[in-house]
UniProtKB/Swiss-Prot annotation:
Keywords: ATP-binding, Isoprene biosynthesis, Kinase, Nucleotide-binding, Transferase. It comes from Prochlorococcus marinus (strain NATL2A). It is an enzyme of class 2 (transferase). GO terms for biological process: isopentenyl diphosphate biosynthetic process, methylerythritol 4-phosphate pathway; terpenoid biosynthetic process. This is 4-diphosphocytidyl-2-C-methyl-D-erythritol kinase.
Length: 319
């Protein structure tokens, strides 16, 4: 799919996965969705989307993963059509080739980050000149995690995850070992349903109470590296429901907790992916290499990752 030379009708987007450094379920909103308080972080485990501009109204998608639909139910297709409808130019089209590296159904926002990359990439490829906040607002129509994935980095996320408060600091030094059992996926709606069944009686019911909890999250210095040694400050509420009912998550968390020098160990999102934080990427990579046989025996896919300050990277150069 790569043209003979770089040109303005071709673009590559690297779409970064995310982890949840914090996830609290506060209660039920008036629209029936859960009210959440989260801290999300982009990591360098990435999908790659190659895009070639068309001018014949055609939007094509192909992928290296046969599990990926190339129809209208795919978030990439939804994002492309949403953007085209927004600018009211039905002649716009694109060929997209997806290299899928982020595991599916893993709590890593793999589909959402692909949609974010599509919006950012086509905004540039189609020369639409929409601002980031316009793309974030537009993306809320098709997914709660997509607004975060557009700008990425480390952000506090409220509402369904679409209300963003970006955190700014000089360096994101932490590394992580990320694991997932490739034999399972966890349905996000099922995870929230299960949590509501078990803990719904403790839900907050008033927006004033929601705001008190939001302010509590805001008051934490999320750039403080030592914060991630204090397990009382960090939580993933969904882990309380998913861990007991999912042996693969239990296995993952136990193995990660046994690694030397690991700091916070947690499930990401609704799972089943889990991670252990380390002082930096080099330490995480060293530990992964030293324990790779243990992960293989446990049937876990494993990655050493660094944290990213953005959600998507665009370029039109190629090798």
């Amino acid at each position: 799919m790569v043209p003979s030379k770089a040109n303005e009708d071709f673009l590559i987007a690297n779409a970064h996965a995310k982890i949840n450094l914090h996830l609290e379920v506060l209660g039920i909103r008036s629209d029936g969705f859960h009210e959440l308080a989260m801290v999300m972080q982009s990591i360098n485990l990435s999908d790659q989307l190659k895009m070639i501009k068309r001018v014949d109204n055609t939007i094509n998608l192909k992928s290296n993963n046969k599990e990926i639909s190339n129809g209208d139910d795919n978030l990439i297709i939804k994002a492309a059509k949403l953007l085209r409808n927004k600018v009211e130019n039905q002649e716009l089209g694109v060929d997209i080739e997806l290299e899928k590296n982020i595991p599916i159904g893993a709590g890593l926002a793999g589909g959402s980050t692909d949609a974010a990359a599509t919006l950012l990439g086509l905004n540039k490829l189609w020369k639409l000149n929409l601002k980031i906040d316009e793309l974030e607002n537009l993306s809320k129509e098709i997914g709660s995690d997509i607004p975060f994935c557009i700008s990425g980095g480390r952000q506090i996320c409220f509402g369904r995850g679409e209300i963003l408060e970006k955190l700014k600091f000089d360096q994101i030094q932490l590394g992580l070992v990320l694991v997932k059992d490739p034999s399972i996926q966890v349905s996000t709606p099922v995870a929230y349903k299960k949590y509501k069944e078990q803990f719904g009686e403790s839900y907050l019911e008033d927006d004033r109470d929601f705001e008190i909890k939001r302010n509590s999250i805001r008051s934490i210095d999320w750039s403080d590296q030592s914060l991630f040694d204090n397990r009382k400050e960090i939580q993933n509420d969904l882990q309380k429901s998913i861990r007991p009912m999912t042996p693969e998550v239990e296995k993952s968390l136990n193995l990660l907790s046994s690694l030397p020098d690991s700091r916070l160990v947690s499930m990401s999102g609704s799972g089943p992916s889990c991670f252990a934080l380390f002082q930096n990427y080099d330490q995480a990579n060293k530990v992964l290499k030293e324990h790779v046989n243990e992960f293989e025996r446990a049937g876990l896919s494993a990655w050493a990752c660094s944290m990213m300050s953005n959600g998507v990277e665009l370029r039109n150069e190629f090798t």
